[in-house]
Structure formats: structure tokens, C-alpha cells
Amino acid sequence: MNQYETVFILTPVLSDVQMKEAVEKFKGILQAEGAEIINEENWGLKKLAYPIQKKSTGFYQLVEFNADPTVIDKLELNFRRDERVIRFLTFKMDKYAAEYAAKRRSVKSNKKED
């Protein structure tokens, strides 16, 4: 199993309930394929660097997970088919990126405890 990180942008016309529903759909796809979700972050509504599909903002979502490489094809196919997703990027984390992400998560959890 490899460690991956996926960032996807949902269309800004969604309500909070619809946004959470879309995120749960993709997490469900990962879990159904045997992936282990490590971390999930909602970055909220952010301005895009350039307009995509005539939209200048979008809901950013990050998911870190461990999975087999075959799972990525199924996940990205579902991203392409879903009209709510306007962009996505999945990449395999090397050992340094995985260590950095773990360190970042631990610092973030320490800040929440304070």
C-alpha cells in the first residue's frame, strides 16, 4: 500500500449539506476499495487562481489515505463523472512528504488541545 494525498475542488453553488454529502461519497469509495483514510481537511471556500467553468471560487477538500494503486483509477473516474467536482489532483507521497504530513498533523492536533 502506498500513501496518497488528494485535493479536490467542489463547485461553490453547493450548500454545506451537499458539500458534505459529496465528500462522504468519495470517502465511501475509498473505504469500499479497502483504503485507510489517514486525514481529512476541509479548507473551505477559497478563490481560484483563474476561473474554471466560469466559477472563481470553490470548496477545497484534502484527503490523505493509504491505498493500492488500482484504487486511484476508480477514485479519479468518479471525480470525472461527478458534476460537483471542478478540479482534482492525486499524488503519491514519498517518505519525506509522508513524514512532513505526519509532523504537520501532530502540530495541528497540539494547537487544538491548547
Swiss-Prot record:
GO terms for cellular component: cytoplasm; ribonucleoprotein complex; ribosome. GO terms for biological process: translation. SUPFAM superfamilies: Ribosomal protein S6. One of its GO terms (molecular function) is small ribosomal subunit rRNA binding. This is Small ribosomal subunit protein bS6. Transmembrane segments: none annotated. The keyword Cell membrane does not apply. Binds together with bS18 to 16S ribosomal RNA. CDD domains: bS6. Gene3D superfamilies: 3.30.70.60. InterPro entries: Ribosomal_bS6, Ribosomal_bS6_sf, Ribosomal_S6_plastid/chlpt, Transl_elong_EF1B/ribsomal_bS6. Belongs to the bacterial ribosomal protein bS6 family. HAMAP family: Ribosomal_bS6 (MF_00360). The lineage of its organism: Bacteria, Pseudomonadati, Bacteroidota, Bacteroidia, Bacteroidales. The keyword Cytoplasm does not apply. It comes from the Bacteria. Keywords: Ribonucleoprotein, Ribosomal protein, RNA-binding, rRNA-binding.
